[in-house]
Design a protein with these regions (language model features):
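Canonical P-loop GTPase G-domain recognition
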Residues: 64, 70-128
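P-loop/Walker A phosphate-binding loop and immediately adjacent motor/lid segment at beta-alpha junctions
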Residues: 50-68, 74
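Short, contiguous strand/loop micro-motifs
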Residues: 14, 68-69
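Short, solvent-exposed coil/turn linker segments
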Residues: 6, 69-70
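N-terminal accessory targeting/assembly segments
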Residues: 1-58
Length: 128
């Protein structure tokens, strides 16, 4: 189900800083503990704020894409991104993270997604 990413092919100099390499390795080592992926992007620049390695790293995991600062984004471009991300099987939510109510309303949806994974026998819930 999960694939292994060879982070050694990413140089430590140039565009891929060492702290990103280290974080990628740590995430890969912790994948068995991941039930649900929540990826936070800037709604104004979702393509630029997205890490393409995450698609491979978290393949097979339910994923929520949160597009923050939705009030500042172009509605037309937001619709296009929503369609594209949903084709990839991701749940897309636009929000203003300063609004605590919006943020708290996401928790039940995350629980439902994690429980759906549990029913498929692919969850890490109840882990030590």
């Amino acid at each position: 189900m999960a694939t292994t990413i060879d982070f050694s092919r990413y140089p430590l100099t140039g565009w891929y800083p060492g702290h990103m390499l280290k974080a990628g390795r740590q995430m890969q080592a912790s994948l068995k503990l991941v039930d649900l992926v929540v990826e936070l992007l800037d709604a104004r620049i979702p393509g630029s704020s997205r890490n393409p390695i995450f698609d491979q790293l978290f393949r097979g995991r339910p994923t929520f894409i949160l597009l923050n600062k939705a009030d500042l984004a172009s509605p037309r471009v937001s619709r296009e991104w929503t369609a594209s991300l949903r084709k990839e099987g991701k749940k897309v939510v636009f929000l203003d993270a300063r609004d605590t109510r919006q943020t708290l309303e996401l928790v039940p949806a995350w629980r439902r997604a994690a429980l759906a994974e549990r029913s498929k026998g692919r969850t890490a819930l109840n882990r030590p």
